[in-house]
């Protein structure tokens, strides 16, 4: 029987664009299911008796930590197994968990469902980035990844429009609760979750390309692709991490335990200060898991470790973009609750305008950013990071105006340009990390990139805005306080800009020195 990885032999440009189209739709649904919580937040807060910090936890941390944590072993599986099958399974899982969100009666139940959504969605981008990197040549890669990333904004925008419309119509039709006692926000979860199960059938029909074909470095399939996945579980999931560390020796186990103790102490201190035990327990779990994984990777796969964790340039890009995401995710989540509270806007109208502006602005931003990044790279190896820097600098003034104006029309008008500018950096940053590793490492590189966007951005940004809002009594203050991280992001990206040409030029040599047989 032919191995599924060898059933497609040569790149096909038309089919590559077809695959990209399907993956954009998948990513749109990914963000519909992820982002719809924003338009439902005020209703959930009222019905489940939650606070702003709780909402930030549900949207960001409960989802984001487990998305990042499971993204590591699933990224490894994407490097070794049939990527189309992996996306198909993940899509079915996260759609089912979104559907279950609609039956939640407590904050704890909703948090558990959000964790499940995070685990399922962790399959998507490592597999998609790897697939697209094999279907598209290097000179078109940032454009392809930017188009794929547009699904983030299209899906996020659609979620607000769909969610607002469903909640309003459902509550009008069933003011005391509908079938099974479901209220509007619960019906919205069901409406966006169930279609994903059908989409999974379509995704399963995609062909699997030869790994490394677009770079001329064909990587043969592994005879036992799940071995690496299981190994990663022992490096990421506590308490399996202790077994994994013990297998490497007494010293690695001692270091792992010491770091774990430091994390527990730090999480306890932050929980004592804020009162948010679940938030900091989850952040501590994520930090410990990432440390355990990186430590094991250094022993087990030194070439991959050296090109990812041993590369200052790679890490600077991850942190730099992660801090952009820190603010962007918070703005994305809190914009709808903000206009409902401050301007008393209707849910359906706000969802339509902010959702439409976010979708259009995000789509334009990632497409223009990707094309501009590819263009600048032709004459400057670090040219893509100029675009990333634009995404870190340009939106700040518009954000400050948006969350201080007393004019609702101006607030709405600023949403499109603000989203467009903040989305410039995504395709450029993602493509930069893909270029800094070998083809077989792309899934792991993508998982690492998303550690920054999730543990730094998603798991902390919305929560911190909510926590500052709760402390200050002002959601505007909560969101604006996040601008304090912008200078750190800019510094990281500027240093990466200076070091990137040397890092790319030395890629193969560093891999050989680390033991890669090339």
Positions of predicted regions on the chain:
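Extracytoplasmic gate region of multi-pass secondary transporters
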Residues: 37-38, 248-282, 312-359, 366, ...
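Central cavity-lining transmembrane alpha-helices of secondary-active solute carriers
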Residues: 58-76, 129, 356-369
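Cytoplasmic membrane-interface "Motif A"-like loop-to-helix N-cap segments
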Residues: 80-91, 374-391
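Conserved MFS/SLC helix-loop-helix module at the cytosolic interface between two early adjacent transmembrane helices
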Residues: 69-108
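Extracellular/periplasmic helix-loop-helix junction of adjacent transmembrane segments
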Residues: 38-69
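Helix-breaking motifs and short loop linkers at transmembrane-helix boundaries and internal kinks
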Residues: 49, 82, 103-109, 120, ...
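C-terminal transmembrane helical hairpin of 12-TM major facilitator-type secondary transporters
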Residues: 381-429
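Helix-loop-helix hairpin linking two adjacent transmembrane segments in secondary transporters
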Residues: 148, 152-211, 244-284
